[in-house]
C-alpha cells in the first residue's frame, strides 16, 4: 500500500465523522483520489502533502471525464474534509464555482432510472448482493436499507415494514407488496437471509460488508445506486395513475386536467411516504414535474 493511501486510511480511522455509510464512502473516495494522484505523477505524498496544484489537477481530470456534478461535489467534500483534518482548509476554495464545477441539477424531466440487467446481476458472486440490488429497484430501498433489512421480520404479507434502525432519519415506514414479482423477490430474500439481515455471517460489521458490496458492484459496472429508487418511483407512479410520469415522457403538470392533478398529487404523496421522504415535493427529483 502506498504511503498516501495508508495515511488517508488512518486519517479516516481516527476521525469518525458522520454515519457508518458516510465514513465508508469518504474512505473509498479518498482511496480513489490517492490512486489518481499517483497515476498523474504525484509520488511519495502523505496526508500532509496536499497542495492547490493537486486539487486543480484532480478537478481538471474529473471535468474531462464528464462526471456528473453530484459525483464531483461528493469528491470535493472528501477533499475538503482531508484538508480540514490536516489544517490545510485554506488551500481549497470555499465555493465549487471557483473551479467551474457546474451546479447539481435536482429536478429534471429526464429519467435517471436504472433497470437492472439480468446479465449484470448474474455477474455478482455474492447472492445477498443480488437480492439487495433487486430490492432497491422493486421497493425503492436505499442501499443501507437493502442491506440491513431482515426479510423475515419485514414481510407482513401485503407489505414490507422497515425498522427505524434500518432507515435514513430513523423513520419506520411501510411499502406495499402489490405484484407477484415483488412477492417472489421477498420470498427469495427470506431464503437467502435465513432469518437474519442480508449481511452474510462471515462479515463482522456493516462497514466491512459495505466495502465488499461496493467492490462487487463496481466490478460489474454499477457505481451508483440511486437510479434504482428512480426506477421504483416511476413504476409505482405508473401503477397508481395509469400513465407515465413526466421523466418518462408522460404529461407535465401543466398538461393535466383538474381531475388528473388530484390523482397526480395523491400518487406523489403515497410514493413520497413509501420512499421515506417527508415532503411530496421531493418526488419531482424522481418523477419530474
Predicted features, each with a name:
Residues 178-241:
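Active-site/catalytic core of tyrosine-dependent DNA strand-transfer enzymes
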Residues 114-143, 262-268:
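Basic, Lys/Arg- and aromatic-enriched nucleic-acid-binding interface segment
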Residues 148-186:
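Conserved tyrosine-mediated DNA breakage-rejoining catalytic core shared by Y-recombinases
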Residues 135-159, 284-285:
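Short, charged phosphate-coordinating catalytic segments
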Residues 159-165, 249-289:
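Short functional hotspots where side chains directly engage DNA or cofactors
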Residues 9-104:
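N-terminal core-binding DNA-recognition domain of tyrosine recombinases/integrases
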Residues 100-119, 169-181:
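DNA breakage-rejoining catalytic core of tyrosine-based enzymes
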Residues 221-265, 277:
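Short basic/aromatic active-site micro-motif
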Amino acid at each position: 500500500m502506498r504511503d498516501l493511501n495508508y495515511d488517508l486510511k488512518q486519517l479516516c480511522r481516527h476521525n469518525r465523522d458522520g454515519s457508518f455509510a458516510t465514513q465508508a464512502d469518504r474512505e473509498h473516495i479518498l482511496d480513489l483520489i490517492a490512486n489518481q494522484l499517483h497515476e498523474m505523477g504525484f509520488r511519495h505524498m502523505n496526508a500532509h502533502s496536499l497542495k492547490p496544484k493537486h486539487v486543480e489537477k484532480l478537478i481538471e481530470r474529473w471535468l474531462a471525464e464528464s462526471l456528473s456534478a453530484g459525483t464531483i461535489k461528493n469528491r470535493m467534500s472528501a477533499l475538503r474534509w482531508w484538508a480540514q483534518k490536516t489544517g490545510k482548509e485554506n488551500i481549497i476554495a470555499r465555493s465549487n464555482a471557483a473551479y467551474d464545477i457546474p451546479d447539481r441539477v435536482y429536478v429534471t424531466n429526464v429519467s435517471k432510472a436504472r433497470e437492472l440487467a439480468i446479465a449484470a446481476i448474474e455477474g455478482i458472486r455474492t447472492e445477498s448482493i443480488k437480492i439487495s440490488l433487486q430490492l432497491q429497484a422493486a421497493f425503492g430501498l436505499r442501499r443501507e436499507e437493502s442491506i440491513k433489512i431482515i426479510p423475515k421480520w419485514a414481510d407482513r404479507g401485503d407489505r414490507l415494514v422497515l425498522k427505524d434502525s434500518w432507515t435514513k432519519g430513523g423513520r419506520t415506514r411501510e411499502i406495499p407488496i402489490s405484484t407477484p414479482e415483488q412477492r417472489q423477490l421477498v420470498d427469495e430474500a427470506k431464503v437467502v437471509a435465513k432469518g437474519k439481515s442480508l449481511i452474510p455471517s462471515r462479515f463482522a460489521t456493516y462497514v466491512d460488508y459495505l466495502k465488499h458490496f461496493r467492490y462487487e458492484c463496481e466490478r460489474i459496472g454499477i457505481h451508483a445506486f440511486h437510479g434504482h429508487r428512480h426506477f421504483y418511483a416511476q413504476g409505482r407512479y405508473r401503477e397508481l395513475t395509469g400513465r407515465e410520469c413526466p421523466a418518462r415522457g408522460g404529461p407535465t403538470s401543466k398538461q393535466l386536467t383538474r381531475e388528473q392533478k388530484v390523482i397526480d398529487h395523491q400518487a406523489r404523496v403515497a410514493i413520497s411516504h413509501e420512499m421515506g421522504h417527508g415532503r411530496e415535493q421531493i418526488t419531482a427529483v424522481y418523477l419530474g414535474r
